[in-house]
């Protein structure tokens, strides 16, 4: 890894990286063949949990009168794929990620999801370097202002659909994976969601969770619960 990249990340994150190999892994997509250092998938898994914990802590402190439900809505808005992808671009991470040839023309939601994953992998590296005390300043730097501004009126699509379905006929939405395609490192899931008494909808995404939310959003928009198309989220 170029020293210029490490120096740039140190400046942008406020963290001096101890493990250069781990940092390389955080910036390597699984489409890179025969990568000696591996890829960011396991780091992304860990970073997602660390991000959720520290943002939840931040919200708990910022909004002492907020209910658990409101805090959950705010949390979803701060750790979703779009927010993380926005921060990735703010940091300049997209230009630092190593990807295979077939991934270089990626765009739209799938590209945003990849950028979001890299941010979470980077969070994991900082956490493994020095624990929560090291990663907390980074989270505060890029999430604090957003935490104070995030709109608590729009809820996670699956949560809102669940509550809406319960008010309609007292049942829960049912999700079913009807198709999985794409490469192992870049899958596409197609999920159908059904609510008894209503026409089902289908959504797709880079993970089962993303596809479920996309399908839930379609019903919410169709039934007039959501007035605009929301961007896919992660977390």
From Swiss-Prot:
Compartment(s) where it occurs, according to its Swiss-Prot or TrEMBL record: Cytoplasm
Keyword Flavoprotein: no
Keywords: Cytoplasm, Endonuclease, Hydrolase, Magnesium, Metal-binding, mRNA processing, Nuclease, RNA-binding, rRNA processing, rRNA-binding, tRNA processing
Required co-factors: Mg(2+)
Domain RNase III, residue spans: 6-131
Coiled coil: none
InterPro entries named in the record: dsRBD_dom (IPR014720), RNase_III (IPR011907), RNase_III_dom (IPR000999), RNase_III_sf (IPR036389)
GO biological process entries: mRNA processing; regulation of gene expression; rRNA processing; tRNA processing
Catalytic reaction list: Endonucleolytic cleavage to 5'-phosphomonoester
Top-level EC class as recorded in UniProt: hydrolase
CC terms in the record's Gene Ontology section: cytoplasm
Active site, renumbered: 48, 120
Binding site for Mg(2+): 44, 117, 120
Family according to the record: Belongs to the ribonuclease III family.
Described purpose of this protein according to its UniProt entry: Digests double-stranded RNA. Involved in the processing of primary rRNA transcript to yield the immediate precursors to the large and small rRNAs (23S and 16S). Processes some mRNAs, and tRNAs when they are encoded in the rRNA operon. Processes pre-crRNA and tracrRNA of type II CRISPR loci if present in the organism.
Protein's name in the database: Ribonuclease 3
């Amino acid at each position: 890894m170029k020293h210029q990249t490490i120096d740039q990340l140190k400046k942008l994150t406020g963290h001096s990286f101890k493990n250069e190999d781990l940092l390389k892994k955080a910036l390597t997509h699984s489409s890179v063949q025969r990568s000696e250092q591996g890829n960011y998938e396991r780091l992304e898994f860990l970073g997602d949990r660390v991000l959720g914990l520290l943002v939840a802590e931040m919200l708990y402190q910022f909004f002492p009168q907020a209910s658990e439900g409101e805090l959950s809505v705010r949390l979803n808005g701060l750790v979703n794929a779009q927010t993380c992808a926005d921060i990735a671009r703010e940091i300049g991470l997209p230009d630092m990620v190593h990807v295979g040839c077939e991934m270089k023309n990626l765009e739209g939601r799938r590209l945003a999801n990849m950028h979001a994953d890299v941010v979470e992998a980077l969070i994991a590296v900082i956490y493994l370097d020095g624990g929560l005390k090291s990663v907390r300043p980074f989270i505060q730097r890029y999430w604090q202002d957003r935490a104070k501004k995030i709109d608590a009126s729009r809820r996670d699509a699956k949560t809102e659909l669940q509550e809406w379905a319960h008010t309609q006929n007292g049942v829960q939405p049912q999700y079913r994976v009807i198709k999985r395609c794409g490469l192992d490192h870049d899958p596409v899931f197609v999920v159908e969601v059904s609510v008894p008494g209503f026409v089902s909808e289908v959504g797709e995404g880079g993970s089962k969770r993303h596809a479920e939310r996309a399908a839930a959003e379609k019903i919410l928009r169709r039934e007039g619960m959501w007035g605009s198309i929301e961007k896919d989220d992660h977390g």
